[in-house]
């Protein structure tokens, strides 16, 4: 059975989607995107582009969407007769010399024929003949079309969209030729169709290289995008704006976010998240939701002074409501980003953590902590570790709901990256000088896990567990009634003294210092 264009595209991008989900952490996704933009936004951008091509009317693949042209047509400077003639015309590569002659003509009517011819040659192929642009030195003339009347701007933008979608740093060539500044100015155009295409060009630019990302990540572009988001209801414009912001926000020079209105951006992105009904969205709206959540994830992690805005504008309540929606966890990428936003807020101050806990997040964590998706499981364990590092009341919430026995089981079955988050969550319980919590540690197998962590080969895990052990030994000494440290006795029974003595020869200075302190203070007779 033959595979259709749509099926082939869906298969290609479903595969990339699965590859993205297999990545370990959001930080890994961010790091990977520096060299090769593998984020979902990139995948959806490429998919949208290819779908745009296959949706062109057939068999006459040279025609253009009548809806778009109806707006353009009202503002053209050439004759309507020529406009419609070019609209229906078919151009082939065999006509290239004639097309170039028209394109280079000083006569506007002839030049327009050339523009349309080039655009249709680039658009009609799945792998467009971009090389003809550079072999025939046409790029400068195409860019100059951005300064002309709207029908030329439309054709020029379509050409640049196709050129910048190439694989050989074509975007850098367009920028070097002065095209970016002209495209940026078109974001002020009175026609949404022109603004949309200008954004599409910029969207292509920001997905090309790290050099291009850094070049475009500036207040001029950001402020224009923020203004567009604040003034439009056009779904395509919104989609491009949030995709560009998602890609560029992490490349803003020296992280000087005070040069852009971050508060306004947060509120606009939050409104979009709240407005979009996840269970009745089309694919474009879902992509917008993904990008918006990714933006808030980045902001909540890296621009921490704005966390309170997220709590005040209602988006966090909406996110938690969305997380609680039945079967939302099946959309693993979205579920992960939503949890990451919540985790970033919990990682803030006590008031911020308490607000999140008041919304019932702990029940969600318990429900999903045994997920088979290791990336999600690690994120959940990280969130729990932040809660367990908080005030005693919040530690007790985790105890009361029964999360710690589950964490102990996860530690014994999981890989290194998850174990360290579990260790943090368990060891944070020791940092309270309260008999209730410390007795809980002793009576529920957590001390055994801490000792297992000390025996591991991971420096970070050993250090965290040694710190916890010091807290416990101090507690045992303080509560001793006959001079016997019952924590010390338990450790001896587990055969940990030899382990501690051997760790004094560890290459890590801090491990040596901790083990030396433990033996000197609590086992001086050894």
Predicted regions and their residues:
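Intrinsically disordered, low-complexity regulatory regions
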Residues: 1-98, 112, 116-121, 483, ...
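Elongated alpha-helical scaffolds that mediate protein-protein interactions in large eukaryotic proteins
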Residues: 84-92, 109-113, 121-140, 153-154, ...
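Buried hydrophobic core positions in alpha-solenoid tandem helical repeats
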Residues: 98-100, 141-143, 182-184, 224-226, ...
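Alpha-helical solenoid repeats of the armadillo/HEAT superfamily
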Residues: 106-119, 148-164, 190-207, 218, ...
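Charged catalytic carboxylate motif
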Residues: 113, 137, 155, 182, ...
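Alpha-solenoid repeat scaffolds
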Residues: 128-129, 140, 149-152, 170, ...
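Internal alpha-helical scaffold/solenoid segments in large eukaryotic proteins
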Residues: 167, 186, 379, 387, ...
């Amino acid at each position: 059975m033959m595979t259709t264009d749509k099926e082939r595209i869906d298969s290609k991008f479903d595969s990339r989607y699965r590859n993205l989900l297999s990545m370990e952490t959001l930080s890994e996704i961010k790091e990977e995107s520096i060299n090769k933009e593998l984020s979902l936004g990139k995948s959806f951008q490429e998919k949208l582009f290819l779908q745009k091509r296959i949706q062109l009317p057939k068999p006459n693949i040279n025609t253009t969407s009548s809806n778009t042209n109806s707006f353009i047509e009202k503002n053209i400077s050439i004759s309507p007769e020529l406009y419609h003639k070019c609209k229906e015309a078919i151009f082939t590569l065999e006509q290239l010399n004639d097309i170039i002659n028209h394109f280079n003509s000083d006569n506007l009517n002839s030049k327009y024929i050339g523009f349309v011819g080039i655009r249709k040659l680039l658009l009609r192929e799945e792998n467009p003949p971009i090389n003809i642009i550079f072999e025939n030195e046409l790029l400068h003339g195409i860019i100059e079309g951005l300064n002309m009347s709207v029908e030329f701007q439309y054709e020029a933008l379509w050409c640049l969209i196709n050129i910048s979608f190439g694989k050989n740093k074509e975007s850098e060539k367009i920028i070097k030729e002065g095209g970016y500044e002209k495209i940026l100015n078109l974001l002020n155009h009175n026609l949404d169709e022109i603004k949309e295409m200008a954004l599409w060009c910029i969207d292509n630019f920001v997905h090309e290289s790290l050099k291009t990302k850094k070049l475009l990540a500036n207040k001029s572009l950001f402020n224009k995008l923020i203004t567009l988001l604040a003034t439009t209801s056009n779904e395509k414009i919104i989609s491009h704006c949030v995709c560009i912001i998602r890609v560029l926000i992490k490349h803003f020079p020296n992280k000087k976010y005070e040069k852009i209105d971050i508060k306004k951006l947060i509120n606009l992105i939050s409104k979009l998240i709240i407005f979009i009904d996840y269970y009745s969205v089309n694919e474009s709206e879902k992509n917008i939701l993904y990008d918006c959540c990714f933006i808030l994830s980045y902001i909540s992690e890296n621009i921490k002074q704005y966390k309170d805005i997220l709590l005040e504008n209602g988006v966090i309540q909406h996110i938690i409501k969305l997380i609680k929606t039945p079967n939302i966890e099946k959309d693993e990428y979205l579920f992960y980003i939503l949890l990451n936003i919540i985790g970033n807020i919990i990682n803030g101050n006590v008031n911020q953590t308490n607000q999140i806990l008041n919304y019932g997040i702990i029940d969600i964590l318990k429900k999903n902590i045994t997920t088979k998706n290791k990336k999600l499981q690690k994120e959940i364990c990280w969130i729990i570790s932040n809660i367990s590092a908080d005030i005693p009341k919040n530690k007790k919430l985790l105890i009361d709901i029964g999360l710690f026995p589950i964490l102990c089981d996860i530690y014994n079955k999981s890989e290194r990256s998850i174990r360290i988050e579990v260790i943090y969550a368990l060891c944070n319980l020791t940092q309270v000088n309260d008999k209730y919590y410390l007795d809980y540690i002793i009576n529920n197998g957590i001390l055994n896990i801490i000792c297992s962590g000390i025996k591991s080969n991971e420096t970070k895990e050993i250090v965290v567990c040694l710190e916890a052990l010091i807290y416990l030994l101090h507690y045992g000494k303080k509560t001793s009634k006959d001079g016997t440290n019952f924590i010390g006795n338990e450790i001896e029974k587990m055969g940990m003294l030899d382990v501690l003595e051997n760790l004094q020869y560890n290459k890590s200075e801090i491990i040596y210092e901790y083990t030396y302190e433990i033996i000197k203070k609590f086992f001086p007779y050894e």
